[in-house]
Regions:
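Mature extracytoplasmic enzyme cores
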Residues: 264-302
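C-terminal substrate/ligand-recognition segments
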Residues: 216-220, 226, 349-370
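Reverse-transcriptase-like RNA-dependent polymerase core
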Residues: 338-351
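Bacterial N-terminal signal peptides
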Residues: 5-15
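Coiled-coil termination/hinge junctions
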Residues: 297-329
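Sec/Tat signal peptide C-region and signal peptidase I cleavage site
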Residues: 16-20
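Short, structured secondary-structure elements
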Residues: 21-267, 317-336, 340-341, 360
Length: 370
């Protein structure tokens, strides 16, 4: 009976005119600076956030709870920051530390731990739909650990959030993109891969883009874009044509596997290439047509074929020949309608009108301070 209840609720909502005008909801209003409120118990707050909390408590005649005992505080911060309890030695050291900033010292120590990135990177990996297998009935293994490790390193390195997002949406399009920035685009290679027989490749490609648009909306905007795949959204201010404007960015993506060697693999390949160079020099110095040269040439050909392979990563790459994007009637890719140019939902901050706008432009718009 759940759907009947929802239907009646929305009928009631519309009948009373409660839906309001587009853009009036607080979520679509640019954030503003608010000075911390004045509080009565001025000696309790240790930072501006405490003042907001205390002001709310005082407005309801409530008082803050007393500070917990040190051992409980230590356990809480350990579980929050790195997901692991403190060791007996860490407990002893903290209980013996009588400095006023003893707690701050623990926090700094935990933030520099590799476990911090492993703990907090998981939250992003869940949102990025990270998995080590393809999904569907075959659910074959896939190599995605390089993207996972990139997220962990970015978290531990305190990578600025705008850079964190741009590299995942369009790292391959950055000037002189590094291997790590290309690996970051694995964010949108976490889509399911259907390796079953008889698969329509174009349908699967379109389904992957649908997933990328929906994920972008949910993770970065907090909006359910998926409904606008087939029609104007019923309760979020997103039109179907706006959905396909975002679709247009991901429609220009190819999905290669790229060699991203580990340090050990890189050194192994480097040593191999050095051997090829040395053997090539011997071939060139040997007499043309001689048996010695023929033997060296055979050895060289065999050596080149034996070049060590490196780990591959699923990444995104911008197409050299752009695709035309259409709006799909009822979300059906076999029913293309009008041609759509790249763009963004009108309810959000303005985007420069340009037919040449690409995924990097979109990524920078997403991370704009507006």
């Amino acid at each position: 009976m759940r759907w009947q209840s929802l239907f009646l609720f929305f009928m009631f909502w519309n009948a009373l005119g409660l839906q309001g005008k587009e853009g009036e909801h607080w979520a679509f209003i640019p954030p503003q600076h608010h000075a911390p409120p004045v509080v009565k118990q001025a000696d309790w707050p240790k930072n501006p956030i405490d003042r907001f909390i205390l002001a709310e408590l005082e407005s309801t005649n409530l008082k803050p709870s007393p500070e917990t005992e040190k051992i409980t505080l230590l356990r809480r911060v350990h579980l929050d920051v790195i997901g692991l309890p403190p060791t007996p030695d860490e407990v002893k050291a903290f209980l013996a530390d009588q400095r006023p900033n003893a707690y701050e010292v623990v926090v700094e120590r935990l933030l520099t731990s590799p476990r911090y990135g492993e703990r907090w990177g998981r939250h992003w990996l869940d949102a990025a739909r990270y998995a080590d297998s393809d999904g569907y009935s075959h659910d074959a293994p896939r190599v995605m650990w390089q993207y996972r490790d990139w997220v962990i390193r970015a978290t531990n390195d305190d990578l600025p959030f705008d850079q964190f997002v741009v590299e995942q949406l369009a790292g391959d399009m950055l000037p002189n993109a590094t291997a790590a920035q290309r690996v970051a685009t694995g964010f949108h290679r976490n889509t399911q891969i259907n390796s079953e027989g008889g698969v329509d490749r174009e349908q699967f490609r379109i389904d992957s883009i649908f997933d990328r648009v929906a994920t972008t909306g949910e993770v970065l905007f907090g909006l359910t874009f998926g409904c606008a795949q087939c029609h104007d959204h019923k309760y979020d201010p997103i039109k179907q044509v706006e959905y396909y404007r975002m679709f247009a960015y991901y429609n220009q993506v190819d999905e290669p596997r790229r060699e991203i060697p580990t340090t050990a693999e890189f050194n192994e390949q480097k040593n191999h290439d050095q051997k090829v160079t040395e053997l090539s020099a011997k071939v060139n110095s040997a007499e043309q047509g001689s048996d010695t040269r023929k033997k060296l040439e055979a050895e060289l050909a065999k050596l080149k074929k034996a070049r060590p392979r490196a780990t591959t990563a699923l990444v995104m790459m911008q197409r050299s020949s752009p695709r035309v994007t259409h709006r799909f009637i009822q979300g059906n890719f076999t029913r293309p309608a009008e041609v759509i140019k790249p763009g963004v939902p009108g309810i959000l901050h303005s985007f420069p009108e340009s037919e040449s706008a690409n995924r990097l432009d979109f990524a920078r718009w997403v991370t704009s301070r507006k």
